[in-house]
Amino acid sequence: MAEKTQKSVKIAPGAVVCVESEIRGDVTIGPRTVIHPKARIIAEAGPIVIGEGNLIEEQALIINAHPDNITPDAEDSEPKPMIIGTNNVFEVGCYSQAMKMGDNNVIESKAYVGRNVILTSGCIIGACCNLNTFEVIPENTVIYGADCLRRVQTERPQPQTLQLDFLMKILPNYHHLKKTMKGSSTPVKN
């Protein structure tokens, strides 16, 4: 099974993916994305496409799972891809099933985002917030506190460029990395 799993994981050049992370199913990881040890990305109901410059921290779980009311062997249930945009941050211990996510979003520690939520861009889901509604979260929305209160911020969260650069230098010193795919369309410089 591990043999089959490895073949369907595509890691773009420039991404840093620690061997201790768990990646199962058809997963595509974009360039400049950093995946910490113990992060889990599981594509069982369809592929997961992760864009450029995302940060996925320890114990974060990104899962494209079958909805509770649909059995995996139902013939009419075709795979639905989970699309994650660019410059998103998945903090320690968060759980995301959101099928569509834009750019510059932050899912903070221990937050839960359900399958029927669509995050646009610039959203922050606060620590321990549980979001499991059928809705599209408007741009630049902040969801915070025990009651999951909402407000709109004036600007998007800044991309974690400096943190990504730092992690790209430091993580290879302390962890083994998964091999990246050599891009057929773009030349790779080592």
Curated annotation (Swiss-Prot):
Q: Where would you find this protein in the cell?
A: Cytoplasm, Cytoskeleton; Chromosome, Centromere, Kinetochore
Any idea which residues bear Phosphothreonine here? T186
Q: Where are the transmembrane segments?
A: none
Q: Does the keyword Cytoplasm apply?
A: yes
Task: Provide this UniProt record's keywords sorted from A to Z.
Answer: Centromere, Chromosome, Cytoplasm, Cytoskeleton, Kinetochore, Phosphoprotein
Provide the Gene Ontology terms for cellular component: centrosome; cytoplasm; dynactin complex; kinetochore
The Swiss-Prot or TrEMBL record describes its family as follows:
Belongs to the dynactin subunits 5/6 family. Dynactin subunit 6 subfamily.
* Record protein name field: Dynactin subunit 6
